[in-house]
Design a protein with these regions (language model features):
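Hydrophobic transmembrane alpha-helices and their immediate junctions
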Residues: 339-400, 430
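Transmembrane signal-anchor hairpin modules in multi-pass inner-membrane enzymes, especially those
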Residues: 1-101, 107-114, 131-144, 189-200, ...
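Long extracytoplasmic/lumenal interhelical loops at the membrane interface
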Residues: 269-287, 295, 299-340, 359-373, ...
């Protein structure tokens, strides 16, 4: 079933001679929407995350991801549905403007410009999702597509000992972060499945994704996986079944993971790791990053300029006789703070809050379906489409939790993960809103004699695009 209002039945006005409460219902002819924009979104998803150009090198002869993103932007403008009124969209445009202003003043103008270009292309991708993923069926298809791509990534990662296909997914820590994002999506899709075959498929996919995280031997990915597991159980409507699934997955990891993996994980708290290992080096780098932020608290030093500026703040200090000039911050947060300052922190933090709000789609359900204290009655009245949307919201929010926790230890601010998840969150809110409003209109028109109490009256919902 589609969720866009235009595809629902239209209620005509009462005709002369009809009963007082008679209602004539006839379908309104709807011009079929072109699928070109949506197909471009699917292709962009494949090339951005699946990266076939890294598997088949001849594909690199053309900048296919760039061409797809630009084509998406053109398709959005041509569609006549382009709108920039959404709050996340406005914030993103403000961020791009801020980055553009930094280009001529940043220490390394080239990387500031290249990062601005990448973020602009992600913005085009985001607009394509918000514009063309406008029905329930399309939302479901894009999530299936996204999971299918990550299934391929998982198999490839396991076969290559935790290494990604290439590009921004080449490093095992970055690959572990991306697969952590996929864990809650597969988990809640399993809960949304209505057939045993589909449930089995998602359970297998979930096990595959978890084992791909294990294959990276990434300690940061392991900590992120623990946070995601807690999130999935907490937000699951079936706590006991989810606990059983979690125990089975833990058993799989215990059986399949080699001893070398556990030796590496156990080194997280070793004194050697904290004092002279990678953890100590990260904390030393973060300390320098904090000094950079304090010296440039409002506007920062410019996007992608941490490696080119850290040398100024070292003041002759070294890490075990080695200079860290040119080193990345190895943290989402210690990239954001010194590079974009309070301006970037406020924009990014507001985006996180709005994404959280948009994934809580039960706020758009008809009054009564999400009320507490009416469980038995609600079980009969639940709309499966809305319940599935709620699970999709949990999946997208869980993906963001996976990104935000695992990225505490790697520099992922300018990767597409967060920005595309934001597009999915906005699209989910819009489709759920449209469907809920349309269902409320149909419910009222189908029983015009029914008295609606003050507390049961459908709320007016203002659609935001």
């Amino acid at each position: 079933m589609r969720w866009d209002i235009d595809s629902m039945m239209q209620i005509t006005q009462q005709m002369p001679g009809e009963a007082r409460f008679g209602v004539a219902v006839r379908p309104k002819p709807v011009q079929k929407e072109s699928n070109i924009g949506f197909y471009l979104v699917m292709l962009a998803m494949l090339f951005e995350f699946g990266r076939p150009q890294d598997v088949v090198p001849p594909l690199k002869a053309l900048p296919i991801p760039t061409l797809l993103d630009v084509s998406l932007f053109v398709a959005v403008l041509v569609s006549g549905k382009a709108t920039f009124s959404n709050t996340q969209t406005k914030l993103w445009m403000a961020l791009l403007t801020f980055m553009a202003l930094w280009v001529p003043f940043a220490r390394n103008n080239f990387w500031a410009l290249m990062t601005l270009k990448e973020m602009t292309l992600y913005f085009f991708f985001y607009l394509g999702i918000v514009t063309f993923v406008n029905t329930t069926s399309r939302m479901q298809k894009i999530i299936f597509m996204w999971l299918g791509v990550h299934a391929f990534l998982g198999v490839n990662g396991i076969l290559h000992h935790g290494q990604g296909v290439g590009g921004w997914l080449g490093d095992e820590n970055d690959f572990g972060m991306e697969m952590n994002v996929a864990v809650p999506v597969a988990f809640f899709m399993y809960q949304a499945a209505t057939t045993q075959r589909a449930k089995l498929l998602y359970i297998i996919l979930l096990g595959l994704i978890v084992m791909s995280v294990v294959s990276t031997s990434s300690r940061g990915a392991f900590l992120g996986l623990l946070a995601i597991g807690s999130y999935c159980w907490f937000y699951s409507p079936r706590k006991i079944m989810s606990l059983i699934v979690g125990i089975c997955l833990a058993g799989l990891v215990l059986i399949a993971a080699p001893q070398e993996y556990w030796d590496r994980i156990s080194s997280i708290t070793d004194d050697s790791t904290m004092e002279s290992g990678t953890a100590g080096q990260r904390m030393f780098t973060w300390g320098i990053g904090w000094e950079m932020f304090l010296a440039n608290p409002v506007f920062g030093i410019g996007q992608a300029n941490f490696p080119w500026t850290i040398g100024e703040y070292l003041g002759g200090r070294t890490w075990q006789t080695k200079s860290l000039s040119g080193r990345q911050a190895h943290s989402l947060y210690f990239t954001l703070m010194p590079e974009l300052g309070l301006v970037g922190i406020i924009i990014f933090g507001t985006m996180i809050y709005l994404n959280y709000r948009d994934t809580r789609v039960r706020q758009f359900f008809p009054i009564g379906q999400h009320r507490m204290g009416q469980k038995r009655e609600n079980e009969e009245r639940k709309d499966p489409e809305l319940e599935r949307a709620a699970l999709f919201g949990n999946a997208i929010l869980g993906g963001m939790i996976g990104y935000l926790t695992t990225s505490a230890f790697i520099s992922t601010l300018y990767y597409p993960t967060f920005w595309i998840l934001m597009g999915l969150a906005v699209a989910l809110r819009n489709t759920t809103q449209s469907y809920a409003v349309a269902q409320s209109d149909i419910a009222v028109s189908s029983n015009p004699e029914q008295k609606v109490s003050l507390w049961g009256r459908p709320r007016s919902v203002r659609l935001r695009h």
